[in-house]
Amino acid sequence: MNELLKKNFFSLLLIVLFSLFIFSLALSDLTKSNKEKAWDCVGIYMANYFLPSGEKFEYGMKEKSMASVKVWKEYALEVGIKETDWDKGVNKAVDKHYGSKYSEKATNQCHSFLEATIPNGKDRVKKVAQTLY
């Protein structure tokens, strides 16, 4: 009986450890390609905020863009990306997109990517946007 108890205990322990391993993988760092795409989107969002004069846009788009920048950074820090590494990637993306014309298509693709990648991303952006001003 004692041997059966040990065997069940170790089986249960292995299942728990395996489950924790799988769960930690799900919450782990963004993949390299997703991180690059996130940075690119942050660059697009920042370019939206600093649109050159003469560009047509909705004010709400600027709010959503800035809220999205904040949500991406919060998420990056949550999954273990160092703040300095995140900021370096953001700076490169901002340099790439700064001064570019507004692209509704690119902005909407970034919103879709954020919502698909970040748990509760849409709600998080909405919540942050409500606190901006």
Task: Locate each region found by the language model.
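Generic cytosolic/nucleocytoplasmic N-terminal low-complexity/intrinsically disordered segments
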Residues: 1, 5-7, 34, 63
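Hydrophobic alpha-helical segments
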Residues: 16, 35-39, 107
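Classical Sec-dependent N-terminal signal peptides that target proteins to the secretory pathway
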Residues: 2-29
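Short N-proximal segments of mature Sec-exported proteins
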Residues: 30-81
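Generic detector of short alpha-helix boundary/capping microenvironments
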Residues: 16, 29-30, 50, 98
